[in-house]
Design a protein with these regions (language model features):
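N-terminal leader/linker segments that initiate helical-solenoid repeat arrays
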Residues: 22-75
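Residue at a conserved register position within TPR or TPR-like alpha-solenoid repeats
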Residues: 46, 80, 114-116, 176, ...
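Short solvent-exposed coil/turn linkers within tandem alpha-helical repeat scaffolds
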Residues: 62-71, 98-104, 141-163, 192-199, ...
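TPR/TPR-like (Sel1-like) alpha-helical repeat modules
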Residues: 115, 126-140, 211-237, 272
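OB-fold and OB-like single-stranded nucleic-acid-recognition modules
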Residues: 264-442
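Structural motif corresponding to the intra-repeat A-B loop/turn of tetratricopeptide repeats
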Residues: 46, 83, 117-122, 179, ...
Length: 442
C-alpha cells in the first residue's frame, strides 16, 4: 500500500529544502528554550522509529506552539511511514494542513494517502478532491522560479513541479472514477500520464473509466490504455504476472470489439512508446466495420445488402423479437419493394442448394450470402412441375413464416409466380399419328 509513497522521498526532500530556505529568507525560526532544542536533537539522532515517535509526541505535548511546527509534522508523517501506519500518516497530514493551509507537503501526503488507503466513502473522496485542488492551487507559488534554491537545477525544479501536478491529477482521476464520473476521470488520468507516462496503474484506471462510459467511440481508447498497462515495462510497470494477465485480457477484448486481430500489433507497438493515444486515435468496432461494408454493398449489390441486414438482425441478441415484430407473416420484400440505398429491391436472389423431393419438389433450399449456404427454404403449396438444378439462380418474394438460429434458416411461403428462374415444365412429346390403314382392293 505504501510503495508509491516510498518512491517520493527524494521529491519531498527537494520540496522541503526549498521551503526551509524560504523560511530562512523570511524570518529565522527560534527555539522556545534550550530544552526544546535538546529534545529535537534526541529526535534527530534516534534511529528506532517507535522511540522516535514517542519523542515527537513528547515534543508536541510540551511545546504545542513552536516555530518548527511544520518540520515536526513532517517528521511525524515520515516516522509513521517507517512504522507502516498509513491511517496515522493521513491523520497527521490533515492536522498539518489544518494548522497551516499553505503546507504544500501536507497536501501532497493527503493526495498520496487518499488513493493508497483506498477509502471510497463520500467523506474520504471529498477530502481527496479538496487536497488535490489545494495542491494544484499552491504549486505555482511554492515552486516559482524565485523560490528555487541555488543548489537545485532548473530541470530538477521543473520536474518537482510536474511530479506534484501528476500526483494531484492522479488523485482527481481516482476520485472521479470512484464517483462514477467517468469522462472527468479520463480527463484527469490523461493529465497525470502526460506528467508521468510510466504509471501503468493510471493507464489501467483510464482504460476502466473509458469502458464504463459505455460510449462506442471511447471503447477503442480504453483498449489503448489497457494495451499500455500491459505493454509498459520498467519503472512504474505492473509485475510480470499481472502484465501477462493484462495482455491476455487486452487481446481477448480487442478481438471481441474489432472482430479480428487486424491492427492489434500496431496498437501494442504504439502503446509501448506513448502513454496517451494520439489525436484522432480510433479502433473500429465490428459493427462499424460491418456498417461500412453494408454501405458499400448497398451500392454494389443492394439485393445482397438487404439480406445481410435481415440476417444480422435475426442472429443478433434481439433476433426473436425482430422476427416476431418485423418479419413473421410479412411479405418480403413486399409488393412495393424495400428501398436499399438508391435502389428499390422487389425480389431477393439466391442459388439453389437442394430440392425436396428431388423431383416435383415442394421445397427449395437456397443460399443467399453464398451459393453453398442453406439459408432460405422456399415452400410451395403444390409440387413444382420440374425441379431446378443445384446452382440455379432464383429471384423470389414471399411470406416469412418461421426461422431457426441453429442451423440458421428462414422459411418463405411462395407462389410460383413470385419466383423467377424456375425451369419450365417439360412439354409432353407430341402423339405419333398412325398412318391411315391401306384401302383393300376389291
Amino acid at each position: 500500500m505504501l510503495n508509491i509513497m516510498k518512491k517520493t522521498t527524494a521529491a519531498i526532500a527537494l520540496l522541503c529544502l526549498g521551503s526551509a530556505l524560504a523560511w530562512g529568507q523570511a524570518a529565522q525560526p527560534q527555539w522556545k528554550d534550550r530544552a526544546e532544542f535538546d529534545l529535537f536533537e534526541l529526535i534527530r539522532k534516534e534511529q528506532n522509529p517507535q522511540a522516535k515517535l514517542q519523542l515527537l509526541q513528547q515534543w508536541e505535548q510540551k511545546y504545542p506552539q513552536t516555530d518548527f511546527k511544520d518540520g515536526r509534522y513532517e517528521l511525524m508523517v515520515q516516522t509513521y511511514q517507517q512504522l507502516g501506519k498509513a491511517k496515522e500518516m493521513l491523520d497527521t497530514a490533515k492536522a498539518w494542513v489544518a494548522s497551516n493551509p499553505k503546507a504544500i507537503t501536507g497536501w501532497y501526503w493527503i493526495n498520496l494517502l487518499t488513493v493508497s488507503i483506498n477509502d471510497t466513502s463520500p467523506a474520504a473522496l471529498d477530502q481527496g478532491e479538496k487536497a488535490a485542488k489545494a495542491l494544484l492551487e499552491q504549486i505555482e507559488e511554492a515552486l516559482s522560479p524565485a523560490k528555487k534554491p541555488a543548489q537545485v537545477t532548473d530541470e530538477q525544479w521543473n520536474q518537482q513541479k510536474a511530479t506534484m501536478e501528476y500526483v494531484a491529477y492522479r488523485t482527481l482521476g481516482w476520485v472521479a472514477l470512484e464517483r462514477q464520473q467517468y469522462l472527468d476521470a479520463d480527463k484527469y488520468f490523461v493529465e497525470a500520464l502526460k506528467r508521468n507516462p510510466n504509471d501503468a496503474q493510471v493507464s489501467a484506471w483510464a482504460g476502466r473509466a473509458n469502458v464504463r462510459t459505455k460510449q462506442l467511440e471511447r471503447q477503442g481508447i480504453a483498449l489503448f490504455h489497457f494495451a499500455r498497462a500491459a505493454a509498459h515495462s520498467g519503472p512504474g510497470a505492473f509485475p510480470e504476472q499481472a502484465r501477462q494477465q493484462l495482455m491476455s485480457s487486452f487481446e481477448k477484448n480487442y478481438i471481441n470489439f474489432h472482430g479480428s486481430k487486424d491492427g492489434m500489433d500496431e496498437v501494442l507497438k504504439l502503446a509501448q512508446t506513448a502513454a496517451v493515444p494520439p489525436e484522432g486515435f480510433k479502433i473500429e468496432s465490428q459493427d462499424e466495420i460491418m456498417a461500412k461494408q453494408e454501405e458499400e454493398l448497398k451500392k454494389s449489390n443492394p439485393v445482397l445488402a438487404l439480406w445481410v441486414g435481415i440476417k444480422r438482425e435475426l442472429t443478433g441478441p434481439n433476433g426473436a423479437s425482430y422476427f416476431e415484430n418485423s418479419l413473421k407473416n410479412a411479405h418480403i420484400p413486399g409488393p412495393d419493394g424495400i428501398p436499399v440505398g438508391e435502389t428499390t429491391v422487389k425480389k431477393l436472389k439466391g442459388t439453389v442448394v437442394s430440392a425436396d423431393p428431388p423431383k416435383r419438389p415442394k421445397k427449395l433450399v437456397l443460399g443467399l450470402s453464398s451459393p453453398n449456404m442453406s439459408e432460405v427454404t422456399l415452400v410451395f403449396e403444390n409440387p413444382l412441375a420440374a425441379a431446378p438444378e443445384p446452382g440455379t439462380e432464383l429471384e423470389f418474394a414471399g411470406v416469412v413464416t418461421e426461422y431457426s438460429l441453429e442451423p440458421f434458416n428462414v422459411t418463405f411461403e411462395v407462389e410460383p409466380g413470385d419466383v423467377s428462374g424456375l425451369p419450365a415444365p417439360k412439354k409432353a412429346a407430341p402423339a405419333v399419328k398412325k398412318a391411315p390403314a391401306a384401302v383393300k382392293k376389291k
